[in-house]
Amino acid sequence: MRILEEDLKNSTYRIRIESLDDLWYLRNILSEGDEVSAITFRRVEESADVQRSRERERIPITIRLKVEKIEFQDFDNRLRILGTVIEGPEDTKGKHQSITVTVDSEISITKEWDDQHIDLLKEATDEKYVTVYTAVAMDEDEAQIFLIHPYGIQQVGTVYSGRSGKYAEGNYSEASYFDQIVNALKNYSNSIIILGPGFARDRFARYCAQRGVNVIGSFPANRTDSGAVYEFITSADGAKLLSNERIARDKEIVDEFLVAVKKDMGVYGRDQTESALQMGALSDLIITDEMFRTEDGRRSLSIAQTVGTRIHIVSVSNDPGQIVKKFGGFAGILRYRVQ
C-alpha cells in the first residue's frame, strides 16, 4: 500500500493498493459511516432495442460514498464497498452504489482515525511488515506449496512425485519431481522456504541452488502440510526470519495467552475481558479482526487505550486467530489475578 496524499485537516488519506494483502488491511481500516471516494463504472442508459442488440457501455465516474457495508473474502483479489452516494453526478446522489477495489486502485478515505487504524495504515505501507514468503512443505512423495501472508497462510498448490501411493508411476524420477516443484514456484515469491522431514528437503534445496532458485532457508519439520508452516513459525529459526511478520506476532501473543490461562492469569470472552479492562488489570488485550470491527470491539479498544493496556489484533485467517475466536474473539493476559 502507498499513501499518495495526506490531508490531516480533513482526516483524509488517499492511497494506492499495490498487493492483494493490502485489501485485508483496507478491510480492517474501513468502518461503517466512513466516506470513500474513487472511480467506479456505471452502464450507459440506452433504449430497450439497443440494449437487446448489444451490451451496454460502461463509463467511469468519480463518486463519494458513505460506507454501509464492506464485502471481502480472505485471499480474494477484490474488495467491494457499498454505500450511499454523497458526491457524484447529479443523477447518482442519494442512490446506493458500490466501489470495487483491486490491485492498482486508488481510493480516498475520510474517517475518524484512532491509533489502531493509524497503526494498520503504517504497517500496510512499511515493506518490512508485508513481505510474502513461499513455503514448500515436502517429502519424497509430495510437496505442498503455501504463501505466508502477513495475516494468514494460503495453500496454492500440491505436486505429487509419483513415487508411491495412488499417484505412483512406473517411470518415477526425483529430478522430474523437483523440476515440477520449481516450475510451480515460478508463479510466486522469490523468498522461498523449504520445510519437511528426511533428506528430500536438503536434496531439493541443492537442486534449487543449481537452478538459481532463491531459497532463503531449508528447515526440518515433522509434517508436509500447513502444520509444517506453523511448526516453523514457532521455531527459533522461524521467529528470527519472520520477526516482523504479523502472523508470527499473532502466534507469539496467543501462545503467551494460553500459558497465562493455565496459570489462572488469562481471561477470555467479551464480558470477562471487558471487566478486567475496566479494573485496569489487563496487561494485554487480544482481539480478533472480526471483533475489531464491531461496536463491542471498539468499546474494548477505547477502554484499553485509556488504561494503558497493550492491544493485539489477530487475524482469523490463521490458526492463532482461530484459537482466540473459539474463546469468544476477546482474550487478555492479566497483570494480577482478579476474582
Swiss-Prot record:
Domain of life of the organism encoding this protein: Archaea
InterPro entries documented for this protein: eFR1_2_sf (IPR042226), eRF1_1_Pelota (IPR005140), eRF1_3 (IPR005142), Pelota/DOM34_N (IPR038069), Pelota_arc (IPR023521), Ribosomal_eL30-like_sf (IPR029064), Transl-rel_pelota (IPR004405)
GO cellular component: cytoplasm
Known EC number: 3.1.-.-
Keywords: Cytoplasm, Endonuclease, Hydrolase, Metal-binding, Nuclease
Keyword Cell membrane recorded: no
One protein family per Pfam: eRF1_1
GO MF assignments: endonuclease activity; metal ion binding
Outcome of swapping residue 231 to A: Slightly reduced ribonuclease activity
Signal peptide: none
Subcellular location: Cytoplasm
Top EC class for this record: hydrolase
GO biological process: nonfunctional rRNA decay; nuclear-transcribed mRNA catabolic process, no-go decay; nuclear-transcribed mRNA catabolic process, non-stop decay; ribosome disassembly; RNA surveillance
Cofactor entry: a divalent metal cation
Family: Belongs to the eukaryotic release factor 1 family. Pelota subfamily.
HAMAP family for this protein: PelO
Domains: entry comment: The N-terminal domain has the RNA-binding Sm fold. It harbors the endoribonuclease activity.
Assembly, per entry: Monomer.
Classification via NCBIfam families: pelota (TIGR00111)
Function: May function in recognizing stalled ribosomes, interact with stem-loop structures in stalled mRNA molecules, and effect endonucleolytic cleavage of the mRNA. May play a role in the release non-functional ribosomes and degradation of damaged mRNAs. Has endoribonuclease activity.
Name of the molecule in the record: Protein pelota homolog
Protein source organism: Thermoplasma acidophilum (strain ATCC 25905 / DSM 1728 / JCM 9062 / NBRC 15155 / AMRC-C165)
